[in-house]
Amino acid sequence: MLAVPEMGLQGLYIGSSPERSPVPSPPGSPRTQESCGIAPLTPSQSPKPEVRAPQQASFSVVVAIDFGTTSSGYAFSFASDPEAIHMMRKWEGGDPGVAHQKTPTCLLLTPEGAFHSFGYTARDYYHDLDPEEARDWLYFEKFKMKIHSATDLTLKTQLEAVNGKTMPALEVFAHALRFFREHALQELREQSPSLPEKDTVRWVLTVPAIWKQPAKQFMREAAYLAGLVSRENAEQLLIALEPEAASVYCRKLRLHQLLDLSGRAPGGGRLGERRSIDSSFRQAREQLRRSRHSRTFLVESGVGELWAEMQAGDRYVVADCGGGTVDLTVHQLEQPHGTLKELYKASGGPYGAVGVDLAFEQLLCRIFGEDFIATFKRQRPAAWVDLTIAFEARKRTAGPHRAGALNISLPFSFIDFYRKQRGHNVETALRRSSVNFVKWSSQGMLRMSCEAMNELFQPTVSGIIQHIEALLARPEVQGVKLLFLVGGFAESAVLQHAVQAALGARGLRVVVPHDVGLTILKGAVLFGQAPGVVRVRRSPLTYGVGVLNRFVPGRHPPEKLLVRDGRRWCTDVFERFVAAEQSVALGEEVRRSYCPARPGQRRVLINLYCCAAEDARFITDPGVRKCGALSLELEPADCGQDTAGAPPGRREIRAAMQFGDTEIKVTAVDVSTNRSVRASIDFLSN
């Protein structure tokens, strides 16, 4: 066994190879009293990853919360009847012509910061407040995107309410999740009074697949604060990736539940001839499925008709077009179990329905002035919300072949405020502006041509199509013939027409589920019942740690040379755990062994690094950054214990990391006692 050199440096130890030894903290990085070094424990190469079946927690019911940018909701199913998905109650309030199976992602807090309401209730109450009083209330909407866009997300990140006041983002999200928790548990108690609440619910939270680990951890921390689960029962909470959930759900759909935008029958007509509903049980299921008044949706026990036509190796894309982002995932169907394999790491960007809202706001700035719109939003926040609601209603009716102008009501508060601020009315502003496709109606409305409305969609729609085309050009995803368009924004006729026009010509079939806005929510419930359905995923980044290697002249740069006690070491070597775009199986483990730097040490803290490149050599390379910390909490060592052949005072902790799940996970064991060690990875400590 290679001895550890005596060094006056704090580092961490990893048992892998005789060429590794302690690594000092990189230049400029903070040092910690509890950090440890990497020590070679055995003269062997790094062990190959091992696959271990994931341990599943017991549960009686799955409750999924689809926490969206613009709208949210929950659904559940019992373990005794996993094929029956129960949708949440329809919400009170809402907009004319809009289904209320979800509620707006709007949170209202009192001036003191206490919870008041969520969803339609929050929006309507805030709208009815006196303008002066409304300025003191904290109203949050579309705040999910702030987590995605935050480059330095921490537990102390602040969110700004409509009135400009700030509040910790963690508390804002916890308020929203607590609201859904209370509603879901109340409904469960009514449906199953004998169901014990404690430790019987498996919760599922949906997040975009393009979210990085800090954002996923943030949602988990918010769930802890909201009381969904405790840290001691962390396995009762699953993070589901939105396009994956949609993919899981689409596997269950029957032909009449799909719309092929090419005009073809999704199944080509063959399945209808081969399969018939020949039993009263199937007919009863069909009746229940079609019932408008039923909140229970029954899925197929196996796979749907479209999937039954597919063969092992068939590939398809899921484009989740939501309120804030477009999320793209490529799956390959595996047989005989119908499990899924991810072919390329999740991709996408900030091209959601809110992009159309921002385009409308920019249009208002062109007409009325950017300074006026900013002042109006700040001083009349409730009226601004009212205006956005009016636009949302018209946005939903936009279509590529619609004839006739669209009328958007301007709140009286807007008209009055503009006249007081500018000294003339809004009609004069429209005449003086360079915008000739928006007219003024004497009924107090903006009249916008259909062409003008469709133009507001173009930047967002173009971004979605460009992302899909770039994905299809990747060599890893060649052979894709089917694209599922899902998510709330996928309800838009403008988006559907544009995607079909751009991609249909290249032979790609674009299919839209009929209940497209609820696809992710229902899929999240199914994912909670069987989280192992996605068997292989792609790592979005390269992860590893910094180590010391024996210095090799000609291979290692001279500036990395470190000489200690006559031995020559190369510093800052990036030891890779998993590479970007590497296929990682569910349950596959990367194992490393660590030693505390000194006897009696109670905590081992190891810095983790990541980058987008696959071939980074050093933790100081461009693009490599510290992204988190692996923490091992140690119990006091027993004096005189059997250390399994380790040198006196040496204590080996073996950690196993999993990169094939929706979150990076770690477990650890004390080799000398074979006892579990509390292990965690913190991505929010930076």
Swiss-Prot record:
One of its GO terms (biological process) is angiogenesis. The keyword Ligase does not apply. Residues 12-53 are annotated as: Disordered. Highest expression in muscle and heart. Lower levels in liver and kidney. The modification Phosphothreonine is found at T42. GO terms for molecular function: ATP binding. The modification Phosphoserine is found at S25, S29, S44, S46, S276. The keyword Phosphoprotein applies. Keywords: ATP-binding, Nucleotide-binding, Phosphoprotein. Belongs to the heat shock protein 70 family. This is Heat shock 70 kDa protein 12B. It comes from Homo sapiens (Human).
